Every structure is written in C-alpha cells, then in structure tokens.
Amino acid sequence: MRKYKCLVIDPPWNQGKTGKRTVRPNQDLKLNYPTMTKEELLKLPVNVWADHNCFLWLWVTNSKDKKTKEPFLKSAFDLIAAWGFNFYTLITWNKKTGPCPFGPYQITTEQILFSYKGVAKFNSESLGKFQTMFTETSTAHSVKPASFYAEICKYFDGPRLDVFARQVRLGFDGWGNEYGKYEELIKKPHSLVKSKQILRMA
C-alpha cells in the first residue's frame, strides 16, 4: 500500500443546507451526496494512508451535526487526535459569499485544521510563504480552490492523497465515490460505482 506524506481530507459532514444562496439560487435545499457521521469518519483508514511523517489538511465547516448538534470544529479536533495527528494551526478560507441562516451572521468561511504526524519537516522554501487566511470566491458547493492544492504541491513533498476528492488534480492521488465528478473528459472506472470507493493515481 502506498504511503502518503500529504493528506487532504474534505469529509462529507453530517449536515444539511441552511437555505438557497443568492450566488447559486438553483441549488436544492438538500445535499446531493451521502454524508457520514463522526463515528463513521473515525473508522477511515487514515493510519493506512499516512506515512510515518505526514501532513494533514482537514476541511471543516462552521456548522454542526444535524442529529447530535456537536459543532464540526470539535469533531474535527477529535478526528485528528484519533488518527494520530498533532494540531499545528487553523487556516481560514474566506469565500466572500455564503448562506445566511436564522441569525445575524452570513457564513462566508470554511476552516482547515493543519496537522502533522511524526516529525513536522518543512521545506526551507516554504517558510513564511503562507498566511492563516486566504480569500477566493466559491464557485460551486464543496469545490475547494485550485490555488490551495497548487501551494501544497509547490511546497510539500509527495506522495499526496486527496480524500473525498471530486476533481482530478495534478500531483494528487484521489479517493472517494465521486472522484472525477467534475471531469468531463475522464471516464469513471466501473469499480467507482460498484464498490463506492476508488483510488486513482495522478
């Protein structure tokens, strides 16, 4: 089994939608993909994927579990600890747009828990290259900025794995039942539908 020095995990958190966005008013009020509970996410084979020294970028929204009401941010910290990672810092993506639920705040951000396993060995060229907040307009539900992945490829050595990936990205292997969803020119393997899981090499 191939071991990875970089993991990006964008979990299908057990949430619902808070309403239609003005930027994408044609969206349904229900998510169009299956979600996972915290207990299910804890069972992901992260220890199988991760190398002895490994970096992890774990995406998390500002919402909470629709059943347990536990904030996903708390769940995310529990996940990285259970997977054997140490928290390093919190990164914020300012999407500039988002839903406005029943309250004064429009939810325009998502968070990333940047963590490491083993020894955090940074490339000397990466020192001071990142800020803990970046701004880029959201283009579609759950689609993450290409610049985020490009920076990881530039400053962090591979192999790299994108977990619950939808897009095929240069420099990353992909894992998930919607891998390649947004790639018109890529034919999905039959096993993607059959097993609900697929590992594709970039």
In which residue ranges do the predicted regions lie?
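Class I S-adenosyl-L-methionine-dependent methyltransferase catalytic core
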Residues: 1-202
